Amino acid sequence: MILTPTQADLDLFAELSGDANPIHVDPDFAAKSGFGRTVAHGAMLTAWLVRAAGLSETPSSTSAMFPAPAFAGEALVVVHDGEAWQLARQQDGVVVCRLLLNAPVPSEEFLVVSSEASLPLKLGMTRESETEPKADTFATLQGLQSRAGEKPLSGEAAQILAGQAYMLGLISTLLGMELPGQGTNYLKQETSWLGSIKPGEKVHACVTITRLRPEKALVDLSTRVQNQRGGILAQGRALVSARDVKGAF
């Protein structure tokens, strides 16, 4: 299967999730970044691979790594290596997303660094959001995901997968827009899925810094999504690069 993330796809996912990180939607900003041009959201690539896996049941966890950028307009090939699902650039074979399904997700622990006192970013820094999905958000996400699906899904399964994609988008938004901020590059996201979004409910997302590695411009964070009653829907951890985030280190 060949999937090509167009700039229109990136703009649409940014609109649906709120993640307007300029490395995805601003060609001028991206041209000055380490990428040189706009790149696809890791959350969107994950949503595509989950759909491409053709699962009979929705996953209990997703563990995605993004070892290289997926550029807007470049074709990607879906590959299954027996253990993981991958998206690789058709042009050079470089893997841009590697996904494990239903694997254990370790908890994130706080790790202190000796130079933290002098850093703008601090352990325990948190950013939160509260959103209520629009009525057509999940239908639009289902349409975007369906491009990666060779097998039809039941209405309930498609709704749950769209909800998971939406929650990944909320986490991505906090990382890419607030903490560390604009220019953030997603490297890894591990998520346990503990519940699903109910129509008409507000959703609360939260990310918290748990580790800083200034020598590599890396930031580890815990990630969580809850419903309006406080029930945990998603819990996990993220690893990002703040190389292109102004003033991060």
Locate predicted features.
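HotDog/MaoC-like acyl-thioester-processing domains
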Residues: 1-2, 61-127, 197-249
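Hot-dog-fold acyl-thioester-processing enzymes
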Residues: 1-60, 106-184, 246-249
